[in-house]
């Protein structure tokens, strides 16, 4: 094996892609700050129990090792959201609204799909301390603005609400092990597996589960869902929240679709969930949702919603047309006037390299004791 090879699923950014990433990173953080989101830089490593938070899906993706200093298990962050919950519980005013944003590399033991990286760069924004639908609207609009900044067009917004699945499981009085099995089936959208599970287990409201897994499409599915789940008030409320979101984004001329059986990969989502799709990509390019109960892991009680996406993946997929400045070559001589002239040009944005080995054609000339650029 060659020494320059990287592990499977680990990649890097170089050349124009690296420049595009850094330019975009700065623009995104400027965008988030203009909306009042504060930049945070969570640590790469924490105690594994505060990273995993009893989530099997996060645990499966987290690299863990024994810390010789504390003799406790440490983990490398595979998802930023649990860290934001810890940061908020430590620093936020109990009744105040807090906004956070970040762009950080993460590491995962396994990729989300065959073509995905195990070392994404996760960009995101999260809002804590407000339960109303206006918070969901704010973070979705900010997510769409992020994609617009990345010049991604023809976006379809997919909306769901994990409260529907959770409430149906509660109504059916399911045990935790059955909920776990069903969650995996719904995540994979496997109708045959659902039918097999229901045939082997005596589940209350089995027909409702069969209906839910296929409830996706345009706004007409909301009316259909109201008819199916009218006897479960929590689900009716969840559908009404989706209807409010639909009205808002329809007025913004956003193409909206619904997936009422969406459960998301991470168990901490417990309300409105959303994802952005574009015809240029075969999978969701950004996603997010509510996780009002997550902060309880840190003895807090803070409603929260947010979104994230893999910035490195999107940079890899883009045509990166960077407006690079012409590189100027300065002679390798010790001259105070030349040094001052070069520094002045650099401060104005010019890119200047010192011709250390004397092989390049220099772009500076001295006339009458003064330095100037060659014409």
Feature roles, as predicted:
Residues 144-149, 163-173:
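Hydrophobic mid-domain F-helix/FG-region of cytochrome P450s
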């Amino acid at each position: 094996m060659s020494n320059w090879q990287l592990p499977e699923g680990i990649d890097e950014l170089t050349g124009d892609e690296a420049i595009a990433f850094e330019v975009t990173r700065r623009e995104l953080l400027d965008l988030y700050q203009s909306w009042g989101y504060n930049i945070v830089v969570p640590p790469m490593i924490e105690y594994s129990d505060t990273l995993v938070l009893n989530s099997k899906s996060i645990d499966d993706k987290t690299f863990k090792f024994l810390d010789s200093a504390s003799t406790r298990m440490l983990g490398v962050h595979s998802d930023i959201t649990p860290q934001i919950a810890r940061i908020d519980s430590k620093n936020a005013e109990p009744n105040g609204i807090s906004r956070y944003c970040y762009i950080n590399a993460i590491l995962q033991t396994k990729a989300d799909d065959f073509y995905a990286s195990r070392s994404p760069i996760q960009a995101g924004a999260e809002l804590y301390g407000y339960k109303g639908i206006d918070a969901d609207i704010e973070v979705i609009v900010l997510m769409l603005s992020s994609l617009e900044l990345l010049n991604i067009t023809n976006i379809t917004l997919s909306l769901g609400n994990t409260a529907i699945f959770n409430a149906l499981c509660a109504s059916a009085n399911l045990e935790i092990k059955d909920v776990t099995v069903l969650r995996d089936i719904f995540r994979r959208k496997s109708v045959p597996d659902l039918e097999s599970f229901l045939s082997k287990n005596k589940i209350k409201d089995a027909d409702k589960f069969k209906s839910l897994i296929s409830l996706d499409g345009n706004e007409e599915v909301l009316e259909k869902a109201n008819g199916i789940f009218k006897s479960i008030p929590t689900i009716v409320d969840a559908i009404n929240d989706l209807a409010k979101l639909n009205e808002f984004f329809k007025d913004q001329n956003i193409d909206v679709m619904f997936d009422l059986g969406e459960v998301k990969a991470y168990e901490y989502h417990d309300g409105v969930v959303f994802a952005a799709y574009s015809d240029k990509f075969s999978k969701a390019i950004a996603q997010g949702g509510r996780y009002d109960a997550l902060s309880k892991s840190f003895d807090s009680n803070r409603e929260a919603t947010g979104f994230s996406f893999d910035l490195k993946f999107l940079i890899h997929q883009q045509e990166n047309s960077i407006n690079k400045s012409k590189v100027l070559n300065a002679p390798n001589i010790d001259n105070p006037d030349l040094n001052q002239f070069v520094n002045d040009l650099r401060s104005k944005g010019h890119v200047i390299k010192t011709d250390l080995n004397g092989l390049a054609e220099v772009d500076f000339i001295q006339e009458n004791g003064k330095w100037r650029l060659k014409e």
